[in-house]
């Protein structure tokens, strides 16, 4: 995918030597967090490796759960666990996939890269930003 290499280079990242690998048995179960771009991938991992199901999300799904939940947990791992509990109590939305740029022109790759930048920035904020004093103090 020369388009992906070009768009990454425009963002200062060299992926020219990157080689995709298949997910092997045990990889997802050993991970602290598995982020997928599509719900079908998340669902396949949950079926194939049930121990990983609570730590496997689409990128957009996890961001939504973290932002909507207002979690005051102190650590990223605790926030992820709370998001998994919220998912069990709620719904999975079909519109939480990231589009696959394969076959798109270069501008399509750029658009998806910009979308990923936004979602990843939101994820980092939701996982690592300090807890607002009003949430963490117990005061209402």
Task: Cite the ranges covered by each PLM segment.
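Short polar/charged helix/loop
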Residues: 1-140
């Amino acid at each position: 995918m020369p388009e992906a290499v070009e768009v990454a280079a425009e963002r200062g990242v060299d992926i020219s030597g990157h080689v995709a690998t298949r997910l092997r048995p045990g990889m997802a179960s050993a991970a602290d967090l598995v982020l997928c771009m599509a719900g079908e991938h998340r669902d396949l991992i949950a079926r194939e490796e049930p121990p990983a199901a609570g730590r496997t999300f689409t990128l957009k799904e996890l961001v939504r759960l973290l932002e909507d939940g207002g979690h005051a947990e102190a650590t990223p791992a605790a926030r992820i666990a709370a998001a998994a509990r919220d998912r069990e109590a709620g719904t999975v939305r079909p519109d939480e996939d990231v589009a696959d740029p394969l076959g798109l022109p270069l501008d399509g790759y750029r658009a998806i890269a910009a979308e990923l930048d936004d979602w990843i920035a939101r994820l980092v904020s939701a996982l690592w930003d300090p807890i607002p004093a009003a949430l963490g103090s117990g005061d209402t």
